[in-house]
Amino acid sequence: MGVTTAARSLLLTEFVSAFFLAMRYFFKPKPTLNYPFEKGPISPRFRGEHALRRYPNGEERCIACKLCEAVCPAQAITIEAGPRRNDGTRRTERYDIDMVKCIYCGLCQEACPVDAIVEGPNFEFATETREELYYDKAKLLANGDRWEREIAKHMALDAPYR
C-alpha cells in the first residue's frame, strides 16, 4: 500500500489526469452566450412584456369583457369600456397596465376569451423613469403589432396544452 501511494505521488497521476480533463473541456465549444450580442432560445411559455393583439383585418381583439382586470392579483390592469356599437360589440376606450405593479403571473392571458392580451417574448424593456412603465392602449397595441409574428408562433406551439 505504501509503495503504490508513493508511486502515485511521485508520478503525479492525479495531476496528469486533471490536466487532461481540463484540456478536454478547453477545446470544446463554449456554452456561454455573449448576451447583448447573442440571445438564447426563449420558451413558448415565456412571460415578458404585455401586448394587445389585433385580428388579421386590423381590428383590435379586446371585447372589453374585463376578465383580465378582475383576475389580476396585483390590480395592475385598468379598463374602461366604450359604448356598444350598432352591431352589439364593445371595445375599450382605455386599457392601461401598470407594469410596476405587474407580477407577470399570466392570469390575464389565461382569462382572455379572445387571446387579446398576451405576454410576449420581449424581456428587454428597462426604462429610466417609472412613468415609462405605465402602458396605455396605444403602447400595448404597438407591442402587439411589433411582436405579432413571434406571439402567434409561440401560441401555436403552446396550443395543445391550453
Curated annotation (Swiss-Prot):
The keyword Repeat applies. Its main location: membrane. It is an enzyme of class 7 (translocase). [4Fe-4S] cluster 1 binds at C62, C65, C68, C112. Binds 2 [4Fe-4S] clusters per subunit. It is found in: Cell inner membrane. GO terms for biological process: aerobic respiration. Its cofactor is [4Fe-4S] cluster. Pfam families: Fer4_7 (PF12838). One of its GO terms (molecular function) is 4 iron, 4 sulfur cluster binding. It is a peripheral membrane protein. SUPFAM superfamilies: 4Fe-4S ferredoxins (SSF54862). InterPro entries: 4Fe4S_Fe-S-bd, 4Fe4S_Fe_S_CS, NADH_quinone_OxRdtase_chainI. It catalyses: a quinone + NADH + 5 H(+)(in) = a quinol + NAD(+) + 4 H(+)(out). Residues 52-82, 93-122 form the 4Fe-4S ferredoxin-type domain. Keywords: 4Fe-4S, Cell inner membrane, Cell membrane, Iron, Iron-sulfur, Membrane, Metal-binding, NAD, Quinone, Repeat, Translocase, Ubiquinone. NDH-1 shuttles electrons from NADH, via FMN and iron-sulfur (Fe-S) centers, to quinones in the respiratory chain. The immediate electron acceptor for the enzyme in this species is believed to be ubiquinone. Couples the redox reaction to proton translocation (for every two electrons transferred, four hydrogen ions are translocated across the cytoplasmic membrane), and thus conserves the redox energy in a proton gradient. Belongs to the complex I 23 kDa subunit family. This is NADH-quinone oxidoreductase subunit I 2. The gene is nuoI2.
